[in-house]
């Protein structure tokens, strides 16, 4: 696992032509897709293989015992994002309770906020479909994200 969280909580995203609409700005639905992809990339950079978290990966002998469905998502658009823009993306994970967490995604262009996205996940048993504790790997990722971060009392 990587100790320096800036390598797995601060990412970049180049806006591609296919991400834009006829007006040349990011199509609204792209933001939540980028949020989920950034979370996946963050897990990989941290050292977690996709097979440990996501079902249906190539070469996976069995699916994870715990699924992490999205139960809530939200996006705020602050400024237009155009094709060719190079965005900085900052992730801030937060455990909400023993079975859920949320990731806040902050998108910046030249140090200015252009969008924010939030995705909330709940851990459920793939067998019973009932809430369960977060998988150990996700717990480690959440704990590591707190290192060096000052939080309010």
From Swiss-Prot:
What EC number(s) would the UniProt record show? 3.1.2.28
Top-level lineage group: Bacteria
GO MF annotations, alphabetized: 1,4-dihydroxy-2-naphthoyl-CoA thioesterase activity; fatty acyl-CoA hydrolase activity
Q: Which GO terms describe its biological process?
A: phylloquinone biosynthetic process
Disulfide topology:
none
SUPFAM superfamilies per the UniProt record, alphabetical: Thioesterase/thiol ester dehydrase-isomerase
The alphabetized UniProt keywords are: Hydrolase
Question: Catalytic activity annotated for this protein?
Answer: 1,4-dihydroxy-2-naphthoyl-CoA + H2O = 1,4-dihydroxy-2-naphthoate + CoA + H(+)
In Pfam terms, one family for this protein is 4HBT_2
Keyword Hydrolase tagged: yes
This chain's function reads: Catalyzes the hydrolysis of 1,4-dihydroxy-2-naphthoyl-CoA (DHNA-CoA) to 1,4-dihydroxy-2-naphthoate (DHNA), a reaction involved in phylloquinone (vitamin K1) biosynthesis.
> Mind telling me what this protein is named?
1,4-dihydroxy-2-naphthoyl-CoA hydrolase
Q: What is the lineage of its organism?
A: Bacteria, Bacillati, Cyanobacteriota, Cyanophyceae, Synechococcales
